A protein has these predicted regions:
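A Zn2+-metalloprotease active-site environment signal
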Residues: 1-213
């Protein structure tokens, strides 16, 4: 697919840019809370790889390897709170092992709401989209709701404003219809989803206020 080819041609690790440093700082703040939320019975070895590229994508693998494109932050002009919304959502997909039973057991969960499964394993060092990509299917609506709910809780615990989860989806939905937003084909930024997050805020805002830095 075009997205995969694009990802492969643009997969350049970025460890030095201001955007990369911001992503990694947010990731480090969320990590202890993701560890607390881990009920899989196996400790995760969380690791964030930042790729330089315009693609709007981020993903996590069961086990804790994560990746995010700088384009996500730069094109959507994400605040740190909004970056936390994206990372928290992906961490929750990985923690809940969504799609773990996909082909070969090797699974990438992506912000695209896609489960990308490779038959012969995924190169763990370059958490890229493997050439052996076999299947890509959307998460179920239920899994997406679970990832939203878990993600906003991680945000609040780490002192990020959970309201930012709403603004991320609003920014995405404004871009809907643009062909470069592959993630929205499987991950509609719909009103139902935004309303569900809004209903969680009364419980989460006090947690955020307490942990705000």
């Amino acid at each position: 697919s075009q997205v995969v080819q694009q990802a492969q041609s643009q997969r350049v690790l970025d460890n030095t840019s201001h955007t990369s440093r911001r992503i990694k700082a947010v990731f480090e703040r969320l990590k202890p809370y993701a560890n607390q939320a881990n009920q899989t019975g196996t400790p995760f070895n969380w690791q964030m790889n930042v790729f330089r590229g315009d693609e709007l994508n981020a993903w996590a693998m069961p086990g804790g390897k994560m990746a995010m494109y700088t384009g996500m932050v730069e094109r959507l002009k994400l605040t740190d709170d909004e970056i936390a919304a994206v990372i928290g959502h992906e961490m929750t997909h990985a923690l809940l092992e969504h799609g773990k039973k996909a082909i070969g057991g090797q699974v990438l969960t992506g912000l695209g709401g896609s489960i990308l499964a490779g038959a012969s394993g995924v190169d763990a060092n370059i958490v890229g989209l493997g050439t052996d990509l076999l299947a890509s299917k959307p998460f179920s609506r239920h899994q997406e709701s679970e990832a939203d709910a878990g993600g906003v809780r991680l945000m609040a615990q780490a002192g990020y404003n959970p309201e930012a989860a709403i603004s991320v989806w609003e920014k995405m939905s404004k871009l809907e219809g643009s062909s470069s937003i592959a993630i929205l084909s499987t991950h509609p930024a719909n009103q139902t989803r935004i309303n569900a997050i809004r209903r969680m805020l009364p419980e989460l805002m006090p947690i955020y206020q307490k942990n705000k830095r």
